[in-house]
Swiss-Prot record:
Effect of substituting R763E: Loss of aconitase activity and IRE-binding activity
One Pfam entry name: Aconitase
Region (Disordered): 402-454
Cofactor note: Binds 1 [4Fe-4S] cluster per subunit.
PANTHER family membership: ACONITASE/IRON-RESPONSIVE ELEMENT FAMILY MEMBER
Protein name according to UniProt: Aconitate hydratase A
Record key words, sorted: 4Fe-4S, Iron, Iron-sulfur, Lyase, Metal-binding, RNA-binding, Tricarboxylic acid cycle
Residues that coordinate or bind [4Fe-4S] cluster: C472, C538, C541
Reaction catalyzed: citrate = D-threo-isocitrate; citrate = cis-aconitate + H2O; cis-aconitate + H2O = D-threo-isocitrate
The keyword Lipid biosynthesis belongs to this UniProt entry's keyword annotation: no
Additional remarks: AcnA cannot substitute for the function of the phosphinomethylmalate isomerase Pmi, despite the high similarity of the two proteins.
Ribosomal protein in keyword set: no
Amino acid sequence: MSANSFDARSTLQVGDESYEIFRLDKVEGSARLPYSLKVLLENLLRTEDGANITADHIRALGGWDSQAQPSQEIQFTPARVIMQDFTGVPCVVDLATMREAVKELGGDPAKINPLAPAELVIDHSVIADKFGTNDAFKQNVELEYGRNKERYQFLRWGQTAFDEFKVVPPGTGIVHQVNIEHLARTVMVRGGQAYPDTLVGTDSHTTMVNGLGVLGWGVGGIEAEAAMLGQPVSMLIPRVVGFKLTGELKPGTTATDLVLTITEMLRGHGVVGKFVEFYGEGVAATSLANRATIGNMSPEFGSTAAIFPIDDETLNYLRLTGRSEQQVALVESYAKEQGLWLDPAAEPDFSEKLELDLSTVVPSIAGPKRPQDRIVLAEAAQQFAKDVLNYVEAPAAQPAASASPVDEASAESFPASDAPAYGSQENGAGAPQHADGTGAAVPSNPVTVTAPDGTSYEIDHGAVTVAAITSCTNTSNPYVMVAAALVAKKAVEKGLTRKPWVKTTLAPGSKVVTDYFEKSGLTPYLDKVGFNLVGYGCTTCIGNSGPLPEEVSKAVNDHDLAVTSVLSGNRNFEGRINPDVKMNYLASPPLVVAYALAGSMKVDITKDALGTDQDGNPVYLKDIWPSEAEVNDVVANAIGEDMFSKSYSDVFAGDAQWQALPIPTGNTFEWDPESTYVRKPPYFEGMEMEPAPVEDIAGARVLAKLGDSVTTDHISPAGAIKADTPAGKYLTEHGVERRDFNSYGSRRGNHEVMIRGTFANIRLRNQIAPGTEGGYTRDFTKDDAPVSFIYDASRNYIEQGIPLVVLAGKEYGSGSSRDWAAKGTALLGVKAVIAESYERIHRSNLIGMGVLPLQFPEGQSAATLGLTGEETFSFSGVTELNNGTTPRTVKVTTDTGVEFDAVVRIDTPGEADYYRNGGIMQYVLRSLIRK
């Protein structure tokens, strides 16, 4: 119930329905705010409680100074939570564990349910193993179920056990496309109230829904769990960059060309930690599908969100996708009543401004390794000839460009798609990077390959070995998808097909795509050029491209060929799309088809022939490129509201395989002691209703002493599990074959694997174990403190009751927002971290897991204080938290005589409550039982 200090509670009549709303015009200054901040303002008005959210917070947002640096913290309560399976499974594991804890404390386990609607779409597990055949989809689904049966059984139980929790089963679509086509409300209705639809998601590209006027972004699992359980998300009131659009796109240019141009502009400007908001006359000329493509790539821009206001185009899309007339009428009435309707002539207050004339956008691709490295299509072959030198001619001699934190966060998000998290000093500005390679000859090393059917062909540097129509970024956009299918049709009619070394895949983000291909008669043409359906899921975009054909892979590796991929995704970092492929290019779906026909990045597809027709005449791209009228004609005739309504009528039901999964019944989950994917974590063991008093920390040893810019991927890697590591040994001991290890990302529901993977990144350098790389430390419980695995040493410390501490440099915990970086740290027995500075989300996650984040005094560090990591540490003054106050500093002393006052980085009253309770889950659990 809102405190309603501003007398903002009112009613809105729409047809026969009446809704309670909170009027923005009751707050002075609200009219000049950007759309995105108006949405936040309504959120504060509606959730004002006088404690976490006060009238002062509301006034601060109403009186927002567009030129000030962000400093005011506010508590944002998202309307709902969206998840995918990699990042969502651990959230559901925690909910299931909370139910058991409630039962053990004498409460009703059925009380533990998401308080905000939570929806999980299974899309991250399908791998494009099989391709180029009519049964590729069926085979890939069977392989997916084989690999993921334990996880799927668990999610199937969750689907039946929890209220307000829904699961979209595998083989249905990609989370963000399902979100815009079906789940998003634009205006929410709950308990008789109408308010803007907002969300947080456990995936970096959650921002796709910004195209629909819905404010939301990616967060880590701990924040998502908190939001599900009704806790607000802490954030700073951001700067807002106004991005003015004028004019309209020229025929022949696509949404992909537009978004790559915007990526280049925004990365050049620097928008980390900021909202980007589109305005101006050109917004009306930007289709909703194009807006969604732009919103999707907000993480690649570096921004928190990239949002479009509500207008007629929004309403048309809601109608097209089968939303009810009452819902569409509500969205229109609410937006107009609250000043959220787009006025193309208005210029709200913005912190910074950029402008793009849409008519200047030209056909483009981006690569070979970063999404902001845009290349004009007409110059792509020339630029490839220069860039390939970095991969062929003595790569060691090439000076490595230092990765920006935006690139690092994005690159590390494979395959789990964790949300990015950046340090406070970073704005993400940076120019595109390309080799100049002037005057150098294009390297060539042709290799003959023999296919299983006995035919042979030559491949060389630059061969396109993967051509993937993939990713919700583009498969949600009917215009580029139909254009791709028409390129395929015209190519087939001219007698062209893909080159034999190209692995071609089609993996749309929803079944609507294949429905309109079928209805328009275009499916057979896509099949004929090799773009058979391989799955409905992320596939190649997150690196699940599956292996190249054996003979191609062998030739590439034996001869060290710099081969390429072309994909319609959103990220293209080196080695992430396929381990055999060094250079990756982002392109629109029709260009993906064109490059599959050309077979090499050396081909200038704007001038060179892609092949020859039946009569031996050269066929050029212009001969098979569809006109805008042809594309629009198919879209108009093949896509209608009935298609979306039918496709989503039973979206949560799943296929026969899903429905046949054996699932336990009841309010609590029956944990399988043999499972290596899903296990009950120990967060609540021994927990009582009253939290034990906070204690000072004495006799602590250093587990790791780390440098600057240690990312969450260093702390908790998401990628492959090596056999000779504690996690690999654990899986081997539990009967898992090495080929079935899967990734850390897929095993986040098993704390035993994840603890062993904490600080286990092969690139980690622990300064107390010099000369080592990876998860090593020195074990001071043993004579001479030998080098040991971090996990093994932590068990010895825990056995002897010795608390642990981590020492770190600047920007500790940057990269992606990965909850296991904090969970793993806590489960290793770490009680405190002392760093020079923190990334904001990781700092709050540490508190959420009961770990104390401390900061060295200004200008001091482990080095200036002479700390080696061999000391024993004690911390006094922490107990002040028992008196209801948070100490500004605590006294740190070592057995070597070093003393200093460390700054306590518990920054809000809510965080202090979490820490006193031993963590956020314990706090929420006690609160729910008391209710």
